[in-house]
Amino acid sequence: MTQKTILNDTHRALGAKMVDFGGWDMPIHYGSQLDEHHQVRRDAGMFDVSHMTVVDLHGARVREFLRYLLANSVDKLKVSGKALYTCMLNPQGGVIDDLIVYYMTEDFFRLVVNAATREKDLQWIGEQAARFDVRVEERSDFAMIAVQGPGARTKVIDLLDPADTAAASKLGRFAALQTRSRDGIDLFLARTGYTGEDGFEIVLPQEAAVAFWNALLAQGVKPAGLGARDTLRLEAGMNLYGQDMDDGVTPYEAGLAWTIALDEGRDFIGRSVLEYQKAQGAPRQLIGVVMDEKGVLRHGQTVLTASGEGEILSGTFSPTLGKAIAFARVPAGSIEQLRVDIRGKQVPLRAVKFPFVRDGQAQPGVLGD
C-alpha cells in the first residue's frame, strides 16, 4: 500500500510527476529537475519531506540512553534546540540509520530519522529504550517542509509571528526553536538541511501543512522534487542511507569518521568495532570522484583501483559543475589511478575531496584546475 503525505493533492495540482519512493508517492519534479536544482542554489526552493519520521523520546534517563544508542555524543548538546548529526549502529558497527537528534529538555529529545528505515528504526530504538525507562513516541501527526537556498531563511522569517522574527534570524546552524507563523501555526523551525545551502527544515501539524506550503508559494518559494534533492545533496557531499551506507558498512567506511565520538570513553553500541578500525584502519573507504569525460556515473558501476575493485555508490550529473560526480567505495590504499567500467570501457576518474560544491561554487580541485 503506497503511502501519501498530506501534501499529495497539492503536488498533483502543481503538475508534479509522482514516483514511488520507499513506499511513498512522492514528487520527483514539477516540470524541470534542472531548474529546481538551480532554483535552490540561486534563491529558494521547498521540498515536502513529510515522509521522514519524527520520534520524540521522553524520560529521566533519555540522555543516558542516547549516549549508549548513538555513535556521536549527545553530551555536546547543552542548549535547548541544539542539534547533532549522528549514526545509530548495530553491535557490528554497521549503520542502522543516520539521523538528527535535537535536545529539547533534559527529559525530552527529538529524533528525525529516514523514511525507508522507519520500521527497523522504531523497533531497534524501542528495544534499546526499554531498560532506560524511555518512552518512544512516533509523531505521525506532523508534516515536514524543507525550505532551502540563499534566499530561504528570509522568505520563511517573513511568515513568522513578528514576536519571533528576531530569534529566528539569530538562530545558529544546527539549532531549532519552537515558534509560530503569523497565522498562529505552531512550527518547529530547524536551521538544518540536505542540500548544502542555508535554510530551514520545518516540522508542523499535518492539518496546517497545506496552508503553510501555499503561504511559502506566495512568498516566491518554488517547489522542488526528490530529483533535485538528490543532485543537491550529492554535490554537497551528503550520504544517502541505503545507497552510500547500510547495516553492513561502518561510519569509517562511509566517510563519516567525523560523526564518531570515541574520546570520552563512553560505551555505545558498535564502539569496539570502531576502536579496532580506528587503530588498524578500515578495509574500505568512501571517496568522491569526478569523471571529466562525457557520461554519467551510476550506482553499481565497477571502479578499478591499484588495490582492487570497488563500486560507484551515489552517482549523478552535477548541474552546478557540468560533470559527472559520484561517491565510490573502494579498498583502502592508493586512489591515484582510478578507472570506472562503463559498458566494458574503462574511463578515467579523478578522486577529489568532497563536498563537490559549497555555497553554490565548485570546491578547489573539483573541476581539475
UniProtKB/Swiss-Prot annotation:
InterPro entries: GCS_T, GCS_T_bac, GCST_C, GCV_T_N, GcvT/YgfZ/DmdA, GcvT/YgfZ_C, TrmE/GcvT_dom1
GO cellular component: cytosol; glycine cleavage complex
Reactions catalysed, as given in the entry: N(6)-[(R)-S(8)-aminomethyldihydrolipoyl]-L-lysyl-[protein] + (6S)-5,6,7,8-tetrahydrofolate = N(6)-[(R)-dihydrolipoyl]-L-lysyl-[protein] + (6R)-5,10-methylene-5,6,7,8-tetrahydrofolate + NH4(+)
EC number from the UniProt entry: 2.1.2.10
Keyword Transferase: yes
Entry keyword set: Aminotransferase, Transferase
Gene3D superfamilies associated with the record: Aminomethyltransferase beta-barrel domains (3.30.70.1400), Aminomethyltransferase fragment (4.10.1250.10), Probable tRNA modification gtpase trme, domain 1 (3.30.1360.120)
Highest taxon listed in the record's lineage: Bacteria
Class in the EC hierarchy, top level: transferase
GO molecular function: aminomethyltransferase activity; transaminase activity
A single BP term in Gene Ontology: glycine decarboxylation via glycine cleavage system
Listed Pfam families: GCV_T, GCV_T_C
Keyword Transferase: yes
NCBIfam families: gcvT, PRK00389.1
Described function: The glycine cleavage system catalyzes the degradation of glycine.
Protein family per UniProt: Belongs to the GcvT family.
Subunit structure: The glycine cleavage system is composed of four proteins: P, T, L and H.
HAMAP family: GcvT
Protein name, entry field: Aminomethyltransferase
Species the sequence originates in: Xanthomonas euvesicatoria pv. vesicatoria (strain 85-10) (Xanthomonas campestris pv. vesicatoria)
